[in-house]
Amino acid sequence: VAHTLELYSRYTFDYPYPVAISVNAPVGGMEYPMICWQRPRPEKDGTYSKRTKYGLISVIIHEVGHNWFPMIVNSDERQWMWMDEGLNSFLQFLTEQEWEADYPSRIMPERMGGLLNYLKSPNKMPIMTGADSLQSTGYNAYTKPTLALNILRESVLGREQFDYAFKQYARRWMFKSPTPTDFFRTMEDASGQDLDWFWRGWFYGTEHTDISIENVHHYKMDTRDPYKDKIAKKDKRNAEPDRLFQKLNKPLPKRVDAFPELKDFYNEYDELDITDKDRASYEKLIKGLSDKEKAMLKRKGQFYVVDLKNLGGLVMPVVLKVTYEDKSTEEIRLPAQIWRRHPESISKMIVADKKITRIEVDPHRETADVDIENNYFPRRMREHTFGISKSKKPSGNNPLRDKQKAEEKARKEAEEKKKKEAEKEKNKKPAPKKK
């Protein structure tokens, strides 16, 4: 409770009430001003599972957090459920992450499977759906708004700008009744950013994030220098493998070998051989170039064009992780505005001094991309597992109880062993006395 009061006050405004009571009752979570109830409870023997531990911590944070949303920032939860449950769940996530490292929050990557499946399902609804019409309350009012606001904080605005804007919203509207547009306008006004595209996609639309690398094109500068270009083309041609028919036809006798008089100039001619005409043409070209154009021809580097496709329809920033042949990496971040003229597909040029071996979209899993397999170029091999399983009676997952039982068993075994050794020592016959 104290942790919640401290963190929520930091992100919004100081807690204005004299007390905050949390009751661990055998009932579902429910909040009222200054008091709330929540479960789960430990077992009768005092043990509890990992799920019980973190479930209770999370629900305490959540229910105590409702003192801010909607008790003080008094939005209409009967109309716009996400304005209290979603904003509160978002602050709950921030508070959980400062409880301990790698806290298992709902929007951690390993727990997002259900949400990602919902985001790409045909039955999804916009966040801006009236509360009475929602069919997936958990996703629409709690988890999706949490995910959206975290992306806005981490990948769009940045923490400093977002935290300032969110605090301004909370302070401007404490003890008042804001609507969704009040929230949207305040966030834009306080951050100084036009976020219409973000609200439209995440809150009014049902599109999802699925950005695919469709292709990567590798370009090299055509210097027009025959000593470079023709030799490079010849090396590339010579490196090509023979077709199957060429390989099978090699041992066959050829008529021109039997009758050499059939050969002419073109039997020995190679269009990639350097000629005097090539040399003269190149010299003429160089003389007609400006110093800037000459410098461009001499530039050493690799030119790549990455074709990206927005399969999910949701406009998002693009994060590219580029891996080079020497194993070094570079991260390129492109703002969402890159989709402004062509929201369905774009191409991005990368100029590098080294050869690229791999490109990955969303390497930090920050944009909720529903299909990460098309994020790689070249594509990675998918790994799966299979095994043998037998049905068994389900048992509760309570490692703490299992540990205590194992310790109790070991203690009893040690006592039994000690008891047997004592009995054995007692029953030993005394050695006969020497005469």
Segments the model singles out, each with a brief description of its role:
Residues 171-418, 426-428, 432-435:
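Beta/coil-rich, acidic/histidine-enriched accessory regions frequently appended to metallopeptidases
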Residues 1-287, 295:
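Hydrophobic alpha-helical and helix-loop surface patches within well-folded domains
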